[in-house]
Regions:
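Mature, Sec-exported extracytoplasmic domains of Gram-positive
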Residues: 1-239
Length: 239
């Protein structure tokens, strides 16, 4: 599916499949025949997912607007339970680069901030997307009081262990308008690596849209026993 939500063919290949299935949610899952131990020493991933059933235009718009820019690695907005009364466990230092990309449409360049992210810039961006005060951010995030900057570190082997879940793609599958003016988005984490699962977890993300088109995240709730399928979160920077 392209950016206009229309099907297209990007390439054609001919290969053997080990197994395949079509899910109720409209995904074609298949596993390629790849070398296996003892022929190779490391597991090769032959799993793939292709969406057959199209998403609605509104689902596509909300997915692109609210969740695709975040994903499930490097920050924990979508993979933890939180609300406006309980925001202390969010990884603010980790989420900054993702919110930066959503706001400015370009990748965060850490070389522009060799000594950390200035307090005003960091706090204003976080407060644009979350109902939180500057004082709370300084309390919850890793803040350099002496230099008045927030620390940032690139994801790497010392602060992140890659997981199949982390590479999952968030997709909005349902949209509910609440009486208080907020909107609850039902989101599924779709993974095409090894486990090949069209909903590793399902969670409800609550947002509030403003008349100017901006929005704030108000809370996230992981449904059923989904929290059991999420690896322990590694904070980008430890105090």
């Amino acid at each position: 599916w392209n950016a206009d939500n229309k099907p297209g063919i990007s390439y054609i290949s001919y290969t053997r499949l080990k197994e395949w299935k079509y899910t109720e949610k409209g995904w074609f899952c298949y596993e390629l025949c790849v070398p296996e131990p003892p022929e190779v020493s490391e597991i090769m991933d032959g799993s793939c997912l292709i969406r057959i059933k199209p998403m609605t235009e509104e689902q596509c718009e909300m997915s692109e607007r609210c969740v695709r820019g975040l994903g499930y690695q490097g920050q924990n907005l979508l993979c933890s339970n939180w609300n406006v009364e309980n925001m202390s466990e969010l990884d603010y230092n980790g989420m900054f680069e993702y919110l930066y990309g959503m706001k400015y449409g370009e990748k965060f360049n850490s070389e522009d901030y060799p000594n950390g992210i200035p307090k005003e810039e960091f706090e204003s961006l976080i407060m644009e997307y979350l109902p939180i005060t500057a004082e709370q951010i300084r309390e919850y995030a890793v803040f350099d009081e002496e230099n008045q900057t927030y620390l940032w570190a690139r994801l790497g082997c010392f602060n992140y262990a890659p997981t199949f879940f982390g590479t999952s793609l968030p997709e909005v599958v349902d949209i509910k308008e609440n009486q208080d003016g907020t909107v609850t988005l039902t989101v599924e984490a779709v993974s095409d690596m090894v486990i090949c699962d069209d909903a590793v977890i399902t969670h409800e993300l609550t947002v509030r849209f403003a008349e100017d088109g901006s929005f704030q995240y108000l809370g996230n709730e992981i449904l059923n026993d989904g929290i059991m399928h999420i690896p322990d979160y590694q904070y980008r920077i430890k105090e």
